[in-house]
């Protein structure tokens, strides 16, 4: 090599620029950009689970909790459709992986537990021996106006007095109502009493 500096070989590194010190990758914009791109494009290999893919444990009743379904994601879809896709289930491509990772998880209010059990608690009900429609205090009696029947003093009774007629009583009981105490009959102002048929029984 000559003393002439113009004849230096290109590999000669005597006057090479001093290498700039390395900044960490998150500070160097270019390196960070291709690091993220490599992360995104890297092939993810999915190891297939070692459990048997079909069948369910002997004592498990529901098929939703079996190895027959996808182990990490319980989907509700028909079994025929699942059988059709059963070989594709564990071979997930990168796009599917990304899409599944991006998908929103199910809202926390939708419970993942099984069918809720109806819990029956014996609650001591006071006065359990009273008849079904018994209410106390008795409901206020609205003045009954039923145009199908003729004018009845005090309107129609809303429900029969309980018990209505004890047929097999040891002796005939006295009547519980006293018709002579009924108030004088006043015709209803908005009801016409002509052409009355007898009330249907």
From Swiss-Prot:
Entry annotated with the keyword Lyase: no
Region named Disordered: 1-117
Keywords carried by this UniProt record: Differentiation, Nucleus, Sexual differentiation
Biased composition (Basic residues): 38-62, 99-115
GO biological process: cell differentiation; female sex differentiation; mRNA processing
Ranges of biased composition (kind: Basic and acidic residues): 9-37
Subcellular location(s) of the protein: Nucleus speckle
Gene Ontology terms: cellular component: nuclear speck
Record's miscellaneous remark: The sexual regulation of tra occurs through a mechanism of sex-specific alternative RNA splicing. The non-sex-specific RNA expressed in males is not translated.
Function per UniProt: Member of the regulatory pathway controlling female somatic sexual differentiation, regulated by Sxl. Activates dsx female-specific splicing by promoting the formation of a splicing enhancer complex which consists of tra, tra2 and sr proteins.
Domain writeup: RS domain directs localization of proteins to the speckled subnuclear compartment and the purpose of this localization is to allow colocalization and co-concentration of components of the splicing and splicing regulatory machinery to permit relatively high rates and/or efficiencies of reaction and interaction.
Name this polypeptide is given: Female-specific protein transformer
Organism the protein comes from: Drosophila hydei
Gene: tra
């Amino acid at each position: 090599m000559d003393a002439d500096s113009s004849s230096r070989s290109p590999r000669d590194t005597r006057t090479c620029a001093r290498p700039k010190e390395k900044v960490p990758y998150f500070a160097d914009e270019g390196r960070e950009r291709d690091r993220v791109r490599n992360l995104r494009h890297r092939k993810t290999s999915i190891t297939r689970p070692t459990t048997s893919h079909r069948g369910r444990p002997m004592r498990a009743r529901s098929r939703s909790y079996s190895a027959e379904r996808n182990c990490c994601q319980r989907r509700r879809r028909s079994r025929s459709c699942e059988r059709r896709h059963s070989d594709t289930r564990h071979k997930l491509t990168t796009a599917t992986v990304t899409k599944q990772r991006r998908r929103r998880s199910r809202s926390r209010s939708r419970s993942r537990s099984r069918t809720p059990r109806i819990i029956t608690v014996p609650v001591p009900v006071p006065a359990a021996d009273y008849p079904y429609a018994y209410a106390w205090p008795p409901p206020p009696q609205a003045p009954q106006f039923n145009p199908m029947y003729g004018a009845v003093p005090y309107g129609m009774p809303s429900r029969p007095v309980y018990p209505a007629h004890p047929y097999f009583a040891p002796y005939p009981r006295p009547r519980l109502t006293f018709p002579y105490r009924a108030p004088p009959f006043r015709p209803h102002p908005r009801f016409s009493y002509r052409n009355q048929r007898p009330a249907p029984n």
